[in-house]
């Protein structure tokens, strides 16, 4: 797997341990990973802060990919999707991970640290990063999402 851009990653306190495992896995594959935090456990941190930081970083670095982690994956996904240009997908299995990229052109993968075991999350990350947007009929659909976002 080769990436032309770094992979940005962030979590809240519940995703800190999984984030470390994902970073180690990706670095073993010689991928450039930029950790946007947190770097230490703070049970009072707030997932929107990290989701917004990752989204802003990606907006400044077009065509990049990101990974967000919280307990369910729902909160970081909701927060990230508020940012223009972000197409975040909560994924809990490897098949959906591939389809999120192939059909929906997702650029942020959101993971659950509480309800998906680490080994499955690693498979999800690999599938997501290996998949490519297929375009075709999917371009029209994703285009509608982007057009709606621009109108608002």
Curated annotation (Swiss-Prot):
Gene3D superfamilies: Sugar-phosphate isomerase, RpiB/LacA/LacB
Pathway(s) it belongs to: Carbohydrate degradation; pentose phosphate pathway; D-ribose 5-phosphate from D-ribulose 5-phosphate (non-oxidative stage): step 1/1
BP terms from Gene Ontology: D-allose catabolic process; pentose-phosphate shunt, non-oxidative branch
Active-site residues per Swiss-Prot or TrEMBL entry: 70 (proton acceptor), 103 (proton donor)
One Pfam family of this chain: LacAB_rpiB
Enzyme Commission no: 5.3.1.6
The name this protein goes by in its record: Probable ribose-5-phosphate isomerase B
Species name: Mycoplasma pneumoniae (strain ATCC 29342 / M129 / Subtype 1)
């Amino acid at each position: 797997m080769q990436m032309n851009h770094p992979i940005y990653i962030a979590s809240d306190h519940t995703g800190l341990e999984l984030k470390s495992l994902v970073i180690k896995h990706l670095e073993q594959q010689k991928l450039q990973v930029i950790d946007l935090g947190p770097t230490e456990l703070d049970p009072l941190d707030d997932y929107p802060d990290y989701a917004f930081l990752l989204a802003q970083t990606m907006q400044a670095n077009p065509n990049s990919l990101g990974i967000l982690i919280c307990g369910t994956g729902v909160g970081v996904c909701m927060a990230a999707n508020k940012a223009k240009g972000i197409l975040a997908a909560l994924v809990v299995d490897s098949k959906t991970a591939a389809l999120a990229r192939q059909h929906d052109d997702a650029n942020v993968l959101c993971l659950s640290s509480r309800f998906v075991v680490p080994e499955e999350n690693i498979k999800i990350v690999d599938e997501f990063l290996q998949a490519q947007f297929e375009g075709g009929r999917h371009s029209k659909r994703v285009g509608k999402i982007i057009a709606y976002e621009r109108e608002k």
